[in-house]
């Protein structure tokens, strides 16, 4: 679940030749010379202005900053997914697709379109934003003079598109405070070689750190509200459980301690 927040997609391998490069290549072939073709791997991504969105279902929407760190324009695609990261969600993102110039920032707005949410706990969705690179013949990828801003040299290019996803937490207005305020309520139980985390609160507990007797627990995932999650105990682990959670602002909470039951 944590790894899904940034996933790479290989768009393809393309040979990009400008008119000048093509002419030089043809001329070189006639004279027995060879055109040098550069190879490059480019990663196209966007930076997001928050690590999570807290959405009040009674509000008019929530906004998120989107930054293009590349030096050329990209298309920005945005969509909200269900908790399983596959199904549709009762939200629309506006604009769903737009051009964002190089080294510029814009904002998208998430608006509820329907759905029924639990009144006594948070509901989780995923907000995903993807940057799409321009092709040589894309009109939207041209500068103000109508010139393409795609690479102008003969380049064998592998393009990697990065999906940037953050949690969208629907939090009813009846829930007050921050998950970090009640994270101490979590309990921990040994079940053989497993560690069961129980979360009696109405908030998702996004674990930042977890250890038992000073031994680090790997493979951390969130613990759902009024639910449980099981982790693998480190070999020989015993003693106190220590943990930290991620706050609403994306920072680390203080450290909590509890006895292992």
Regions found by a protein language model. Name each.
Residues 88-116, 215-240:
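Intrinsically disordered, low-complexity Pro/Gly/Ser/Thr-rich segments with frequent PxxP/GP/PP motifs
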Residues 1-11:
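Bacterial N-terminal signal peptides that target proteins for export
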Residues 26, 47, 65, 69-111:
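Surface-exposed binding patches on compact interaction domains or structured appendages
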Residues 115-182, 239-261:
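Terminal connector regions
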Residues 21-25, 29:
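Boundary at the C-terminal end of the N-terminal hydrophobic targeting segment
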Residues 66-70, 195-201:
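Asparagine-centered strand-capping/turn motif at beta-strand->loop junctions
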Residues 10-19:
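Bacterial N-terminal signal peptides
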Residues 30-65, 177-190:
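Beta-sheet-dominated interaction scaffolds and their linkers
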């Amino acid at each position: 679940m944590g790894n899904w927040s940034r996933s790479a997609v290989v768009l393809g391998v393309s040979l990009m030749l400008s008119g000048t490069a093509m002419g030089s290549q043809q001329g070189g072939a006639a004279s027995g010379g060879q055109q040098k073709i550069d190879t490059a791997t480019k990663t196209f991504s966007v930076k997001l202005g928050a690590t999570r969105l807290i959405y009040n279902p009674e509000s008019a929407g929530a906004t998120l900053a989107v930054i293009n760190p590349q030096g050329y324009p990209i298309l920005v695609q945005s969509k909200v997914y269900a908790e399983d990261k596959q199904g549709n969600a009762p939200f629309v993102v506006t604009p769903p697709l737009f051009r964002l110039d190089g080294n510029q920032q814009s904002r998208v707005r998430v608006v509820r379109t329907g759905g029924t949410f639990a009144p006594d706990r948070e509901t989780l969705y995923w907000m995903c934003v993807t940057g799409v690179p321009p092709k040589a013949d894309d009109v939207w990828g041209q500068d103000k003079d109508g010139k393409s801003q795609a690479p102008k040299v003969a380049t064998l290019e592998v393009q990697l598109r990065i999906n940037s996803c953050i949690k969208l937490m629907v939090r009813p207005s009846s829930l007050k405070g921050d998950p970090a305020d009640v994270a101490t309520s979590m309990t921990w139980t040994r079940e053989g070689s497993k560690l069961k985390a129980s979360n009696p609160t109405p908030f998702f507990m996004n674990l930042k750190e977890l250890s038992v007797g000073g031994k680090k627990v790997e493979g951390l995932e969130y613990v759902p509200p009024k639910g449980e999650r099981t982790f693998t105990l480190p070999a020989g682990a015993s003693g106190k459980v220590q943990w930290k959670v991620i706050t609403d602002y994306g920072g680390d909470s203080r450290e909590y301690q509890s006895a292992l039951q």
